[in-house]
Structures are given as C-alpha cells and as structure tokens.
Amino acid sequence: MTRSVKKGPFIDAHLLKKVEAAVQTKDKKPIKTWSRRSTILPDFIGLTIAVHNGRQHVPVYVTENMVGHKLGEFALTRTFKGHAADKKAKR
C-alpha cells in the first residue's frame, strides 16, 4: 500500500538537516544514517549516503532513478550464499 499523496513523502528531520547542510556547502563526504525508512528526494541526487544495514554502513550514491524509493532498498540486510549443492550431481 502506498503513502497518501496528501501526507507527502516521509523523511527523518535529522537526515534532512544533514542533506541541506551538505548541499549548501557542496560537501561530497558520505552522510551516515540509520534511517532506512526515509524516502529519497530530488535534493539527494549526487550525494553519497551511508545507510546502515544492521552491521555496517553501505555507501549509496543517489541517482535520478532512485527518487521516490526508500533508502533501505539499496542497502541489503541479508547475504545469500546459495542453496546447498546436490550430492548426486557432484559425482
């Protein structure tokens, strides 16, 4: 279910402050955040945001195609190592 247009996109206030400061100073240093639930706005384009995945901060370079998505979509939380191999196929 999508969010109501009337409400607008959700973004944490502390992240918005950091982004606005980085845009004003034209700072290219990654912005560290734990807010995976925040929506990517057009102001974020060209910035690198380090999104926490539960273990470490994953750098995410924001492009135009990412606008409207959530930050957490681009920092995967699970690592897939593959299914167990079939013992008969190894012989």
Swiss-Prot record:
Organism domain of life: Bacteria
GO cellular-component term (any): cytoplasm
GO molecular function, one term: structural constituent of ribosome
Xref: InterPro entries: Ribosomal_uS19 (IPR002222), Ribosomal_uS19_bac-type (IPR005732), Ribosomal_uS19_CS (IPR020934), Ribosomal_uS19_SF (IPR023575)
Positions of disulphide bridges: none
Keywords assigned: Ribonucleoprotein, Ribosomal protein, RNA-binding, rRNA-binding
BP-aspect Gene Ontology terms: ribosomal small subunit assembly; translation
Pfam families xrefs: Ribosomal_S19
PANTHER family in alphabetical order: RIBOSOMAL PROTEIN S19P FAMILY MEMBER, SMALL RIBOSOMAL SUBUNIT PROTEIN US19M
HAMAP family in the record: Ribosomal_uS19
Function: Protein S19 forms a complex with S13 that binds strongly to the 16S ribosomal RNA.
Family to which the UniProt record says this protein belongs: Belongs to the universal ribosomal protein uS19 family.
This protein's name: Small ribosomal subunit protein uS19
Source species of the chain: Ralstonia pickettii (strain 12J)
Gene for this chain: rpsS
